[in-house]
Regions:
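Charge-dense, helix-prone N-terminal extensions
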Residues: 1-104
Length: 104
């Protein structure tokens, strides 16, 4: 396992009410409503953010709007590189909290 995989797995175990799942074939965190709140993608995390959190995450060096396929950006989803792993938990918590409020 890479350091990113180890950290992401630890976060799954630390954050109440999330479970491991899959999104686009990658490890993700599923909230109680069955929706993905965060995903591990090529040793980066991908989180759904809005407003100030979205802008702050995009301001991190190397972060970008997530594109699962080139030219197909996902609105409000940000890909954050492992170099910012100290910030991962805060963004995962914001994302999972917001996603858990969405309807099934």
């Amino acid at each position: 396992m890479t350091d990113a995989e180890i950290l992401f797995t630890q976060l799954i175990n630390e954050i109440p009410e999330v479970k491991a799942g899959k999104m686009f074939g990658s490890l993700c965190m599923k909230t109680p409503n069955g929706k993905a709140g965060a995903m591990l993608w090529h040793d980066n995390i991908v989180v759904k953010l809005a407003g100030d959190s979205f802008r702050a995450a995009l301001g991190l060096k190397g972060s970008k709007v997530f594109e699962p396929m080139e030219g197909r950006p996902m609105k409000e989803w940000v890909q954050i590189p492992f170099v910012h792993h100290d910030d991962w938990k805060q963004y995962v918590l914001i994302s999972c909290t917001a996603v858990s409020l969405l309807k099934k």
